[in-house]
Curated annotation (Swiss-Prot):
Keywords: Cytoplasm, Elongation factor, GTP-binding, Hydrolase, Magnesium, Metal-binding, Nucleotide-binding, Protein biosynthesis. InterPro entries: EF-Tu_GTP-bd (IPR041709), EF-Tu_GTPase (IPR050055), EFTu-like_2 (IPR004161), EFTU_2 (IPR033720), G_TR_CS (IPR031157), P-loop_NTPase (IPR027417), Small_GTP-bd (IPR005225), T_Tr_GTP-bd_dom (IPR000795). Coiled coil: none annotated. Residues 81-84 are annotated as: G3. The gene is tuf. Residues 136-139 are annotated as: G4. This is Elongation factor Tu. It comes from the Bacteria.
Length: 394
């Protein structure tokens, strides 16, 4: 292979603002784009451009989200900001905007509030790996001791949810003053950008992770064997490599004897590509949609897990009535529906449309899964909820 030509491309990182209502998330987002565009190029975005977020659909759920982008010294960032509290919850649970790290905005005038706690907890449950704190509205607090107290509270809260509270960077600033062009407060935004560059490590790209392909279809080709098709979710599969078929039935091993894309034969299939994989000695009836093809040992089948779930409201096309323990909907993982029963937390009798809730699910068939896997909850083919596996149990 010839050497790739050198391109001046900064690494790409996904981040977002989280925190309590009115603590300044959107103002901070506007301030970041404004201050950084002056220094590193790019376009400044005004508060009302960000606040007026377009609707998006993710897993059948409508979410209002604003996407902005900016450059720092070392990287290019895609940054997501949501106008409403419910939008944040939906966003984090559906993984509509996967975050490599989050900026937690806490107003120094208020300290941590209920949604501060809820966003940190959700961050832990859905696998937001890093949090940086921006202590906002510091121009309105003259008392150094008060600022230290708020910082301590935030660190304690982070530690409570298994984030490294003591080592978390906390930047004291004023998003509004920075947005207005006050140089002292602008420098705090630059400090924040440096922490984004250094505290959030570069994520492992999909191509460098162990091979996984969710099976969408299975064909039998006479004289050649069985072909499964699907989009490679991560990693690379090479001709001649051993792979496992995981989920629904007992895990079996087989060998990839060919990879094709658009009827052309390839040496390998890579993350993001839609491919057909030819399998040696596997019969058509031994494999089905909903299983995955994976690097041996990299993923295991499970039936029981804890999850964080958002239940669609009636207005979003969800259920019109609550559900109770013993509810048995379908759980849609990757390419297939599996029936499962639910257990609710102690003291919770029912779940209303529009709620978000922690629940334990037991499926009737095992599915290849690991913490962080997203799913939809469906009844008769329509989506009534969205969730994420927070902890695999059995």
């Amino acid at each position: 292979m010839s050497k790739e030509k050198f391109q001046r491309v900064k690494p790409h990182i996904n981040v977002g603002t989280i925190g309590h209502v009115d603590h300044g998330k959107t103002t901070l987002t506007a301030a970041i784009t404004t201050v950084l565009s002056k220094k590193y190029g790019g376009s400044a975005r005004a508060f009302d451009q960000i606040d007026n977020a377009p609707e998006e659909k993710a897993r059948g759920i409508t979410i209002n989200t604003s996407h902005v982008e900016y450059d720092t010294e070392l990287r290019h960032y895609a940054h997501v900001d949501c106008p409403g509290h419910a939008d944040y919850i939906k966003n984090m649970i559906t993984g509509a905007a996967q975050m490599d790290g989050a900026i937690l905005v806490v107003a120094a005038t208020d300290g941590p509030m209920p949604q501060t706690r809820e966003h940190i907890l959700l961050g832990r449950q859905v696998g937001v790996p890093y949090i940086i704190v921006f202590l906002n509205k510091c121009d309105m607090v003259d008392d150094e001791e008060l600022l230290e107290l708020v910082e301590m509270e935030v660190r304690d809260l982070l530690t409570q949810y298994d984030f490294p509270g003591d080592d978390t960077p906390i930047i004291r600033g004023s998003a509004l003053k920075a947005l207005e062009g006050d140089a002292d407060w602008e420098s705090k935004i630059l400090d924040l950008s440096k922490f984004l560059d250094t505290y959030i490590p570069e994520p492992k790209r999909a191509i460098d992770q162990p091979f996984l392909l969710p099976i969408e279809d299975v064909f039998s080709i006479s004289g050649r064997g069985t072909v499964v098709t699907g989009r490679v979710e991560r990693g690379i599969v090479k001709v001649g490599e051993e792979v496992e078929i995981v989920g629904i039935k007992k895990t079996t091993k087989t060998t990839c004897t060919g990879v094709e894309m658009f009827r052309k034969l390839l040496d390998e299939g890579r993350a993001g590509e839609n491919v057909g994989v030819l399998l040696r000695g596997t019969k058509r009836d031994e494999i089905e949609r909903g299983q995955v093809l994976a690097k041996p040992g990299s993923i295991h089948p499970h039936t029981t897990f804890e999850s964080e779930v958002y239940v669609l409201s009636k207005e979003e096309g969800g259920r019109h009535t609550p559900f109770f323990k013993g509810y048995r909907p379908q759980f849609y993982f990757r390419t297939t529906d599996v029936t499962g029963s639910i257990e609710l937390p102690e003291g919770v009798e029912m779940v209303m449309p529009g709620d978000n809730i922690k629940m334990t699910v037991t499926l009737i068939h095992p599915i290849a899964m690991a913490d962080g896997l997203r799913f939809a909850i469906r009844e008769g083919g329509r989506t009534v909820g969205a969730g994420v596996v927070s902890k695999v149990l059995v």
